[in-house]
Swiss-Prot record:
Keyword Metal-binding assigned: no
Gene that this polypeptide is encoded by: gatA
Protein known as: Glutamyl-tRNA(Gln) amidotransferase subunit A
Record-stated family: Belongs to the amidase family. GatA subfamily.
EC code: 6.3.5.7
Lineage start: Bacteria, Bacillati, Bacillota, Clostridia, Eubacteriales
Active site (UniProt): 79 (charge relay system), 154 (charge relay system), 178 (acyl-ester intermediate)
GO biological process: translation
Length: 485
């Protein structure tokens, strides 16, 4: 029995019924990872010993008749910018290469409380800055559907690991599309929750007003289970919301009667790949067949999201990354005498080119004379975009768009085309700017490469997104198809 081919919810049921042991499940994923990750590059660190030790402890509890909760020993992979006590937390950067986290992020504490087993730390774009996972300081991540193509980013390791069956569930981080975009390109489900739904405590910051922990799974049910486990208020995160967390599994039903889905014309422009357009149109027909009402709508300000995003995110990044200086912690150049020289050289050698580029851009937009001209204006645009979404979401329950206007491109294809690379998140950034929940659902293939559609919902209505996504899955098998490795 190939346990790595099972979904997380199938594994939970099998462990509950004592059909398999937790240790067997963990060993299956370790063996799978050791067999294929040399091709994929999804893992930066595999925590074999601690995972097997925890699996044995859980098996002993089950044998004693104790009822577990939550994940029942199902393994989870963690993006390497989320703190796990005793494990590396490099952000895929040379400057944090030897940094070991002394504490658990809130999401990790909640995983452990709900019997999730941490299997390792997953590769990413350095400090979550990138859309292709070509910016990792250690190694690139390859798309399981075509090893010569990118998996998307910045959570490319998290999505590629799930797609290649190296892990059933994973956590990524979202700033402008870093879970949804690679989820679409790798053919898995990826959720960005409402800003404030999931605690950011223990996540190394990129842009504090945009960052969120996202969940990734093989299907909507897996994603819903993981999201429920880690959601909820956290007093250690000042942006955490005091909003009750529903039982997301109860929202999973095929019937969409009464659900209104908006179709914004601004997301279906001429530059959208025709084969992707066809897949989205087919998905819409299925949702209609399942009872949903499709309504044409307009989000005229969405086109300004990308510009506002790259001003706001780089400004916040330049401030957040100032603390990584080689003096308090991080890689340190010890051959220099002056603190200023140590600071400059440590950061110059420790940060990659993309990170340095964004720090400089962010410093510029916050400088005298530019703050009002760029940063304040971007904040005003952000407010207008939020109001635009609020207007539409009074008339519909969710909005459907493509997740990405292209499928996975080849390595090096866009590295020298900055605008082309930055536009990779064109369809995901609007929801991030507005702080809304959004999910990517696999909906087909274009020339053998996965395609996904995006659902955007109202604040704290992840349940509706799960409902629509689940309904679609009940009429299709795209989420079940596995890449041949």
């Amino acid at each position: 029995m190939e346990l790595f081919n099972k979904t997380a919810h199938e594994l939970i049921d099998m462990i509950k019924s004592k059909e398999v042991k937790v240790e067997e499940v963990v060993k299956s994923y370790i063996a799978r990872t050791e067999c294929i990750d040399e091709k994929i590059g999804a893992y930066l660190y595999l925590s074999k010993e601690s995972a097997l030790k925890e699996a044995k402890l859980l098996d002993e509890k089950i044998q004693r008749g104790e009822k577990l909760k939550g994940l029942w020993g199902v393994p989870v992979g963690i993006k390497d910018n989320i703190s796990v006590s005793g494990m590396q937390n490099t952000c895929a950067s040379k400057i944090l290469e030897n940094y070991i986290s002394p504490y658990d992020a809130t999401v990790i504490s909640r995983l452990k409380e709900n019997n999730g087993i941490i299997l390792g730390k997953l590769n990413m774009d350095e400090f979550a800055m990138g859309s292709s996972n070509e910016n990792s300081a250690f190694k690139i991540v390859r798309n399981p559907w075509d090893l010569e193509r990118i998996p998307g980013g910045s959570s490319g390791g998290s999505t590629a690991a799930v797609a290649s069956r190296e892990i059933p569930l994973s956590l990524g981080s979202e700033t402008g599309g870093s879970v949804r975009q690679p989820a679409a390109l790798c053919g898995v489900v990826g959720l960005k929750p409402t800003y404030g739904r999931i605690s950011r405590y223990g996540v190394i910051s990129f842009a504090s007003t945009l960052d969120q922990v996202g969940t990734i799974g093989r299907d909507v049910t897996d994603c819903a289970i993981l999201t429920e486990v880690i959601s909820g208020f956290d007093k250690r995160d000042s942006t955490s919301a005091r909003v009750a967390v529903p039982n997301y599994k109860e929202s999973l039903k095929k019937d969409l009667t009464g659900i209104r889905i908006g179709l914004p014309k601004e997301f279906f422009k001429e530059d959208l790949d025709e084969s992707i357009r066809k897949q989205i149109e087919d998905a819409i027909k299925i949702l209609e067949k399942n009872g949903a009402e499709i309504k044409i709508c307009s989000l005229p300000l969405a086109e300004y999201s990308l510009s506002a995003y790259y001003i706001i995110s780089t400004a916040e990044a330049s401030s957040n990354l100032a603390r990584i200086d080689g003096i308090r912690y991080g890689r340190r150049i010890n051959t220099l005498d002056k603190h200023e020289d140590i600071y400059i050289q440590s950061r110059n050698e420790g940060f990659g080119e993309e990170v340095k580029k964004r720090i400089m851009l962010g410093t510029y937009v916050l400088s005298k004379g530019c703050y009002e001209k760029y940063y304040e204006k971007a904040l005003k645009v952000r407010t207008l975009i939020k109001e635009d979404f609020k207007r539409v979401l009074k008339e519909v329950d969710a909005i459907i768009t493509p997740t990405s206007k292209v499928t996975a491109f080849k390595f090096g294809e866009r590295t020298k085309e900055v605008l082309s690379m930055y536009s990779s998140d064109e369809y995901t950034v609007p929801a991030s700017i507005a702080g809304l929940p959004a999910i990517s659902i696999p909906c087909g293939f274009s020339k053998g490469l996965p395609v996904g559609f995006q659902l955007i919902g109202d604040y704290f209505r992840e349940d509706i997104l799960f409902n629509i996504g689940y309904s679609y899955e009940q009429s299709t098998d795209f989420h079940k198809i596995m890449a041949k490795l």
